[in-house]
């Protein structure tokens, strides 16, 4: 990244995260995306006419109609001149949009960009693969779009991603007790953050139309339902004697997040006040089955590009697709627990897969501001053996 004229974050916004068939069940992914985009633009002080491009992550687009990112832009009230691209990099989609936007800005291709992600896992449809040519006789199979394209390995058929996480947890000799304790602490942090109002500067409320009138959703749904005392009693999720449970896995969720990006020189020229600069970003790829440890490689590469060490970073966000993902990063990189996911992670808050990359950047920036810190680094594991990471610094 050019430090002479760095890419900067002008604003951020995210919706609350709803549970599976929960508070946001009646809201399409594109409407969630539009809500986050509209709020991010309003908070940035940028005239919508200045926005040239929008990138939005969306992993489960079946049934949404053409060009989900374009729909989100138009529904948000952006000019029809805004170019839109929908990005699918599985769980890394929302972060990849920020990386792509940053690269476009650094290259001088555009001046103002929106980057984000959106997902309604609740509304992912079931698919009938044979009906194009006709099922003819007998029974057919309905494929769950959410599971097939979001939660199932593409290289070993019918294997849930959690089975690979369990294998790696076994290799690390992570105990059930350690993972339960991590999930309980993540839930405690999320519940405390909600009680203390820590998420208020991130969240834009979603209006849900119901038969009884509009309902305003302004709080993450799932932490309020969490019961720490129940976590140690849950059955293993992916192996008979396994150590990973539903509580130490991220929950199926709905939500969206968006950020407005530009270059420092443009912000200065137009009287806009940036919040943070993007210092570096990186990606890493390895064996698909080892996706849960891929953030270690991405974080190391990102630190090298930034010229930082682990000790230079004030706060980390490592997406808790499973609790063990953050625990692997803590183990391999020496990240202190009190520096990682300080307001709770996806095991407590939820993981709307196309949105989470943008969501954790949003939460990281807000946490740095709230706690008076300066440098942050966010990373996610990605199905297929990949990971991305991004380093930011408050201005």
Regions inferred by a protein language model and the residue ranges of each:
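Condensing-enzyme catalytic core mediating Claisen C-C bond formation in acyl metabolism
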Residues: 1-30, 39, 228-293, 297, ...
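Conserved active-site "lid/cap" helical segment
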Residues: 2-64, 68-72, 76, 80-83, ...
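N-terminal extracellular/periplasmic Venus flytrap/periplasmic-binding protein-like
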Residues: 14-15, 25-34, 43, 178-269, ...
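Conserved catalytic cysteine-centered active-site region
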Residues: 58-112, 155-161, 225-251, 332-359, ...
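Active-site-proximal alpha-helical scaffold in enzymes
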Residues: 87-119, 169-198, 258-265, 330, ...
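Flexible glycine-/small-residue-enriched beta->alpha junction loops
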Residues: 112-168
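Active-site pocket-lining segment
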Residues: 163-166, 202-204, 279-348
């Amino acid at each position: 990244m050019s430090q002479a004229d760095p890419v900067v974050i002008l604003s951020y916004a995210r919706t609350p995260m709803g549970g599976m068939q929960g508070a946001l069940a009646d809201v399409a992914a594109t409407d969630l995306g539009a809500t986050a985009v509209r709020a991010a633009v309003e908070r940035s002080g940028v005239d919508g006419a200045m926005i040239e491009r929008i990138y939005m992550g969306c992993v489960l687009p079946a049934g949404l109609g053409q060009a989900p990112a374009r729909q989100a832009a138009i529904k948000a009230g952006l000019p029809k001149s805004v170019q839109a691209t929908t990005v699918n990099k599985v769980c890394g989609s929302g972060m990849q949009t920020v990386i792509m936007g940053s690269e476009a800005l650094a290259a001088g291709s555009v001046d103002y960009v929106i980057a984000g992600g959106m997902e309604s896992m609740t509304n992912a449809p079931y698919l009938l693969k044979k009906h194009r040519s006709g099922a003819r006789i007998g029974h057919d199979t309905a494929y769950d779009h959410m599971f097939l394209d979001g939660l199932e390995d593409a290289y070993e058929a019918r294997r849930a991603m959690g089975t690979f996480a369990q294998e790696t947890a076994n290799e690390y000799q992570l105990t059930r007790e350690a993972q339960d304790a991590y999930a309980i602490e993540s839930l405690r942090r999320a519940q405390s953050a909600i009680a203390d109002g820590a998420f208020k500067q991130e969240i834009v409320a979603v209006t849900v139309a119901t038969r009884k009138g509009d309902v305003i959703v302004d709080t993450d749904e799932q932490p309020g339902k969490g019961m720490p005392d129940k976590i140690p009693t849950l059955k293993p999720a992916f192996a008979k004697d396994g150590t990973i449970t539903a509580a130490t896995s991220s929950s199926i969720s709905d939500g969206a997040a968006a950020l407005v990006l530009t270059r420092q020189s443009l912000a200065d020229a137009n009287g806009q006040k940036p919040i943070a600069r993007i210092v570096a970003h990186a990606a890493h790829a390895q064996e698909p089955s080892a996706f849960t440890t891929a953030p270690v490689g991405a974080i190391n590469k990102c630190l090298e590009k930034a010229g930082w060490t682990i000790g230079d970073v004030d706060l980390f966000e490592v997406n808790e697709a499973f609790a063990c993902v953050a625990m692997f990063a803590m183990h391999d990189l020496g990240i202190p627990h009190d520096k990682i996911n300080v307001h709770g992670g996806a095991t407590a808050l939820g993981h709307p897969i196309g949105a989470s990359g943008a969501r954790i950047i949003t939460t990281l920036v807000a946490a740095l501001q709230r706690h008076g810190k300066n440098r942050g680094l966010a990373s996610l594991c990605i199905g297929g053996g990949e990971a991305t990471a991004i380093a930011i610094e408050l201005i």
